[in-house]
Regions:
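PP2C/PPM-type serine/threonine phosphatase catalytic domain
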Residues: 1-310
């Protein structure tokens, strides 16, 4: 497990970004999932102020799924700091293409690894901005308030049928073909079409971002994920999600990577005390009484000077 945090300024608040990753073999003898939550770049604490979150799930039932997922994640982590520019989506696309080529070549060079592949879902956190890249059926979710939204779209035959209206989302959860993938990293020399899918988000105070493998979301419903993600500490949230998947009897590896945008209030003009209260000024009621007394005194003086009877 890894856990890091940093602080970024927003106009009226400070966001403390905290991240954590947990993975477990869970329902299988070996763990073909890999995960990371780490600072990248050359800044303080070993990072440039940016976070990289990664989940990769090696293809089950195929050779060397664990090798494919590890190569893909390592290539992604190596490639991103070397990619210049402010276009994080482009940087992720280039890194994904490099990861795909590296996994494919490794499969060609080692006969026992031929045909290996992996999912790859990642997020670059740059200040309050999150850029997500995705290939396969691992997922990214955003929890905002009480609303949990699936950000990514599964690259599976069943997901395509749901999108085309042929079956319902509920039926898809029970469909025996739900794990048949249409796109993965490493099985072809080049990624198809416009892959990876890119999604851009602006994180708000209180948001939670979750990356997870299918061994987790297959057995947990939205309400269970919402409850776990409500934990203030992302490490506790990630552990709770993985343990819940194991308790639900997942037959696959279970992985959760959580990022929390924790609000830390700073003073604003609306919350600062008034100048009078900051400097110990005289209350308005006292001033009014003093003015009234002065008026009475002036009136008495006028009467005495003019010689008028009281």
């Amino acid at each position: 497990m890894s856990a890091l945090s940093r602080v970024v300024d927003t106009p009226e608040e400070t966001l403390r970004l905290a991240v954590s990753a947990v993975t477990d073999a869970a329902g299988r003898d070996e763990n073909q999932d890999v995960a990371a939550a780490l600072a990248i770049g050359g800044g303080p604490s070993g990072g440039g102020g940016d976070f990289l979150l990664v989940v990769a799930d090696g293809m089950g039932g195929h050779p060397a799924g664990d090798v494919a997922s590890q190569i893909a994640m390592n290539t992604l982590m190596d490639a991103l700091p070397a990619l210049p520019g402010d276009d994080l989506g482009l940087a992720l696309k280039q890194a994904y293409r490099r990861a795909n080529e590296t996994v494919f070549r490794a499969g060609e060079e080692e006969p026992s690894h031929a045909g290996m592949g992996t999912t790859l879902t990642s997020a670059l956190l740059h200040g309050k901005y999150a850029t997500i890249a995705h290939v396969g059926d691992s997922r990214a979710y955003l929890l905002r308030g009480e609303v949990l939204t699936q950000v990514t779209r599964d690259h599976t035959f069943v997901a395509e049928e749901v999108a085309q209206g042929r079956i319902t989302a509920e039926a898809a959860r029970r469909d025996p073909r739900r794990n048949r993938l249409t796109h993965v990293i490493g099985t072809n020399p080049r990624l198809e079409g416009k892959l990876p899918d890119i999604f851009e988000l602006t994180l708000l105070p209180g948001d939670r971002l979750l990356l997870c493998s299918d061994g987790l979301y297959d057995v947990l419903d939205d309400s269970e994920m919402r409850r776990a993600l409500g934990e203030q500490d992302p490490g506790a949230a990630a552990r709770q999600l993985v343990e819940a998947a194991k308790e639900r009897g997942t037959r696959d590896n279970a992985t959760a990577v959580v990022a929390a945008a924790i609000p830390t209030r700073v003073p604003t003009a609306a919350t600062l005390p008034s100048p009078a209260s900051r400097t110990g000024g005289v209350p308005g009621t006292v001033i009014a009484v003093v003015i009234a007394i002065l008026l009475v005194v002036l009136l008495l003086l006028a009467v005495v000077v003019l010689g008028a009877p009281l």
